[in-house]
């Protein structure tokens, strides 16, 4: 699948609005890559029979797939972007349009986020997204992330993207600290805490996990 593999990183996002394996054999495809007024532009359009990847669809009628990504980078490494992905099949569209950002406030403080509006089979619970502020230094990592998936997101995105679950509100946080010892035969000591919890949109608890870890790395020579 060279057509999709080359430049696949241009459409990579945490919530996968575009997943090339949703598209089977293609008779043709067009790509566009370049810059427009300081914005990086990536786009593709192609055609395929969706029954190649979805056994519930009858073989015979092709769908048209369109994907576009615009990204603007700043001098400090931050970026803002827009990504859209759509499948036109029969007389209907399925897909999503999303805003993405990676912001570096200081050398150690940053934030990533994604906000998505979906369309397709479902007309309620069509929003998804996450926000993740983080602190990263040579010895410490800390982040808090909140994710939201409406109850109709999976049905709308998955004809052209990939979401494993929806109807959820998720909170997770991670703290990890590394201490350099370099004596008593110990090279370094690392401690970490990871917490994850998610509920349905109605507030019903579906899963939670609390994981604590301690790691010792010894010197090669005592």
Model regions: which residues?
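Outer-membrane beta-barrel translocator/receptor signature
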Residues: 25-26, 37-41, 52-54, 60-66, ...
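Surface-exposed extracellular loop regions of Gram-negative outer-membrane beta-barrel proteins
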Residues: 65-119, 181, 185-195
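Residues that cap or anchor secondary-structure elements
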Residues: 1-34, 40-43
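Exposed, low-structure sequence patches enriched in small/polar residues
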Residues: 113-222
